[in-house]
Amino acid sequence: MSECTHDCSSCGESCADRQGGSPFQIKPLHEGCHVRKVYGVVSGKGGVGKSMVTSQLAVTMQRRGHRTAILDADVTGPSIPKCFGIHGRAVGSEDAILPVQTETGIQLMSVNLLLEHETDPVIWRGPVIGGVVQQFWGDVLWQDVDYMFVDMPPGTGDVPLTVFQSLPLDGIIIVTSPQELVSMIVSKAVAM
C-alpha cells in the first residue's frame, strides 16, 4: 500500500484519508457487515460475456483464499445464479436478506433469488431498479467479504449510474469485444 499523497482526486471513495465531501451519497452497508473491495463489471453492449467474467473473477479470488461475493445489479436480465447452478430462493426477515451461497461459499444476491419462478420477467422502471440495487448493497447481510464484484447491465443507463454514485467502488472491470460499435459504447461507459 502506498503512502497518502493527499491528492484525493486519485483515490477511491473508501480511502480513510479522503478530504472533502463527495458529490454522491454512498449507501452504508447493513449493520455488522464488512466488504473490503468492490469492483463493478461493466460492458457497453450485451452478450460480451460480462456475467461469465464476473463469475470467473469471484471463483478465482475464492480459490486464492479470499471471501468473495457477487451483487447481480443486472436486475432485468439476471444470470449470475444460473452461472452457479443456483435455483433456490434467498431468505430474510423484515430487517435483512441473507445472501445465497454457492457450494464453494461465494455469496450471491440477485433478483432471480427473490422471484417465485426464475423465468418471471422483471418489468420495472429505472428508479425502482436503482432502489433494488441499493437494497442489495445495504439490506443484505454480506458476511465479511474481501472482494465483491457487481455484475451490471450493459450500457450507461440508470443502474450503472446508481452503482457509480451509491456504492464505494474501488475500480471497474470493462468487458468488451473487438467490434467497432462495442468500442464506441465502451468509450461512453469509461467516460462515466
Language model features with spans:
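Conserved catalytic-core segment of NTP-binding enzymes
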Residues: 146-192
